[in-house]
Amino acid sequence: MPSRNLLLALTAGVIVVGLSVFAARAQAPAALTGQVSSAADGPMEGVVVSAKRDGSTLTISVVSDNAGKFSFPASKLEPGRYSLAIRAVGYDLGGPKTADVAAGSTATADIKLRPTRNLAKQLTNAEWLASFPGADTQKKTLLNCIGCHDLDRIITSTHDADEFVQAFDRMTGYYPGSTPQHPQRLIGDARRNLGAAAGVKAMAEYLASVNLSRDEVWDYPLKTLPRPQGRATRVVITEYDLPRKQIQPHDAIVDSDGIVWFTHFGELFLGSLDPKTGKVSEYPLPVIKPGYPIGTLDLETDQAGNLWIAMMYQGGVAKFDKKTETFQTWRVPQQWQTDATQQAFLTPTNSHVDGKVWVKNSDRAQILRLDPATGEWENLGAFKDTSNNRTITSYGIPADHDNNLYLLDFSSSNIGKLDAKTGNLTVYRSPIANSRPRRGRVDEHNRLWFAEYAGNAIGMFDPKSEKIEEWVLPTPWAQPYDVVTDKNGEAWTGSMLSDRVSRLNPKTGEFVEYLLPKTTNIRRVFVDNSTTPVTFWVGSNHGASIVKVEPMD
């Protein structure tokens, strides 16, 4: 089990960049400045400082530098009274807790921190996994948990192994987008698969060994990750609150007009956010399978700029015309429908090549193809890994420039490439064993970039060489969900467990990791290339907000 010192080295050693690189940069006018310090440590680098104006739906955050100094650009803070908050694991805000910002002047707030009395409450999922005793194979069983809830729900429980097994059985009957506030039961014989009974029992016994079922305190030390350093502190983060706490923005993307569009994982709406005004609009999708769970996942665009939505257990897909603000839907043919029919992902990106939209049916691991012009569906069925005759259970399904399809095999290490003309599948294996490719994108050079969820890495498949290259993330237990490249050739991903946004320079192998102000459960990632530097966007799936990350370089 890695020590805290090892965690520090793994992360800090990769992201530190000399501050002299930025010394010549002109400083923008500031609305609020100050220094963060504690009695024990003096000035503190890498503390996320957040400011939220009274009555506003926006929270602006910056990060303290190596002298403990922080600065909010004047362009980001309007005049008014602001509530202050911090994120620095192991510390709480001592004061001040508010600041008054006036037009044309710079306010000052020197922030004092004190040691926290409840470290466990501050730990990220990644820090919990680093803290747990046991083998990595045992810890990885918990990677299936954090899609629905944080690990502290498990860790602070007093369930014994038998009670965990009972809880698992109940959970298999709930829709993936269920929350404690908005539970949805699956219908009929649809169930989520937990695997063989022996594995379920072993997982239950492991969880009962790390929670509070045996004692009132944990019998292992709690380990923390280091705070950001150097270049990772040069960032401004904006969080836009959504109007209802039950909104789960799963996929968030930005169109050419600067409007953010997002899917609701637990409701049948398409949402939009105008970052300039903070206005949120919701467009209800039609119900096409009454009585079944509602919620949407994948959000993609076609060449004409139309938005396409995967409708999950509603058993179909939808297209939204932004000009007319109307939906068109296509339901999977009745003969292929079951209680478990689930359209989580679709790919219209290059449908202009052959007029076909790829759609995944998670039930039975089927690949479908839709002709929107005629409404006709094809069922290409499930595909096998010929080396072991195992079914490829794809997660993301991005398409290349010729509308050939990639199958990211979430239960193994495979990347399958499906020829759109012949229907033949070629399988490629990532060097990291059981890497569990999840979601990804094809770049301008027709290369596939993808997240290796269990491999804790970014992968890139080059179809010319037919080779896969990998870059392991510097933060242990980051478990990336998705990857996208920007106009500069850098690759971006985010952690479902550590609340860090990772930026990779593939030429040098260097990472920069930006710590977000709150628990975020990062899923789909998007980069807006119209800005310089580029801007990163993500939906806070468990936090009912949209997050914008603006690096200063």
Each language-model region and where it sits:
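A short, solvent-exposed loop/turn motif at the edges and junctions
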Residues: 55-57, 79-98
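Conserved beta-strand positions in repeat-built beta-propeller and related beta-rich domains
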Residues: 260-266, 307-313, 357-363, 405-411, ...
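Beta-rich, blade/repeat-based domains predominating
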Residues: 245-257, 289-304, 335-354, 385-402, ...
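Extracellular beta-sheet/turn segments enriched in Thr/Pro/Gly and aliphatic residues
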Residues: 100-125
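Blade-level signature of beta-propeller repeat domains, shared across WD40, Kelch, NHL, RCC1
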Residues: 516-553
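Short, acidic Ser/Thr/Gly-rich low-complexity loop/linker segments typical of extracellular
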Residues: 54-71
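The canonical Cys-X-X-Cys-His
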Residues: 141-152, 203
